[in-house]
Amino acid sequence: MADIIDELIRKRGFASRIFRNREVLHPDYIPDTLPHRENEIRRLAEHLLVSAQGMRPSNVLIYGLTGTGKTVVVKYVVSKLKEKASSLNKRLDYAYVNTRKLDTTYRVIASIAQSIGLRVPHTGLAISEVYRRYINALDSWGGLHIIVLDEVDYYVKREGDDLIYKLVRANEELSKAKIVLIGITNDVNFVENLDPRVRSSMGEIEMVFPPYNAEQLFTILKQRAELAFNQGVIEDGVISYCSALAAREHGDARRALDLLRVSGEIAEREGAERVTIEYVKKATLEIEEGRIYQSVVTLPLHQKLVLKKIVELVEAKESTTTGEVYTAYSNIMRNLKYEPLSLRRISEIISQLDMMGLIISEVVNRGKYGITRIIKIRKDMLPVIKDALKDVEA
């Protein structure tokens, strides 16, 4: 094993020939300037400054597709406001919570409480007790607390909106402090699923982030590339090519940055001197495989079982039907001593897998045999899906 390490060090050394600082290509990086989001920065900062000046806070709901700069703009604005407030001896702080990663109400409220220095155990307290401690500590602190709930639609679908209702009403319980809630979502219909009492308060101010176009993506990538790569390693046309690919996918800056970063990493692995368009093409395939793998491994159990049965049936004869999938799924569930889901629910799961791009399904009319759904899987996706399902016993 040591020989492998020695060989890698001999070939590549400790200093990268490609990257100067690859971190600037990661989605968590917050640059000093955010091209093409000046209007959004100004509008959000104006809303938050009103609250910081002691006026009644207005909660903000931010919509936009993936990679449109929602999260980075919010982080940029709140961190700058915190920095400025600190220099003026004003009390302003924020909690950023990705509610997809912190997947329970307890973990969300604990993270919010911890952001103002409260010590909260990982388990053991009632949610209402953590909330009460947070409100008491916040009022003693006496400043403006900005709570950012990213991917808030996932949280509400999973946990309901009780905590959000408490947070949007929390200012009624506070005499010396204030709370502003910022929700970030990809779902334009998100508020329609909220309790009417929450809906009116959560979306007092709404902002929509439009997708970037290819020209804007080029500016963003050029700015980051100058910081990320050693001089002269990016071949002409690479940044334009990455921008064009990402612009085709609803102007996703995150996708564009991933493409550029992975292209550089592949070039580095292969010992190349420069990042070329060929490496971008390789990166496109690698990222797609990673997306498929993550989509499969994060599926709930029944979806995994259904997909595994589809894989087995498709491998045997290229395509299958809803009825065949349901029979195979029901048999394995009975063997495992579990009650199978209904045929209707399995049909819904198949539709979901189709929408995710993991399978291809088509409803066809077979005359006297009736209407059925033909299900296939792209051949190039089969190995990745099988690998992601390898630990599923079925």
From Swiss-Prot:
SMART domains: AAA (SM00382), Cdc6_C (SM01074). InterPro entries: AAA+_ATPase, AAA_22, Cdc6_C, Cdc6_lid, ORC1/CDC6, Orc1/Cdc6_arc, P-loop_NTPase, WH-like_DNA-bd_sf. Keywords: ATP-binding, DNA replication, Nucleotide-binding. Coiled coil: none annotated. It comes from the Archaea. CDD domains: Cdc6_C (cd08768), HLD_clamp_RarA (cd18139). One of its GO terms (molecular function) is ATP hydrolysis activity. GO terms for biological process: DNA replication. ATP binds at T68, G69, K70, T71, V72, Y212, R224. HAMAP family: ORC1_type_DNA_replic_protein (MF_01407). NCBIfam families: orc1/cdc6 family replication initiation protein (TIGR02928). Belongs to the CDC6/cdc18 family. Involved in regulation of DNA replication. This is ORC1-type DNA replication protein. It comes from Desulfurococcus amylolyticus (strain DSM 18924 / JCM 16383 / VKM B-2413 / 1221n) (Desulfurococcus kamchatkensis). The lineage of its organism: Archaea, Thermoproteota, Thermoprotei, Desulfurococcales, Desulfurococcaceae. The gene is cdc6.
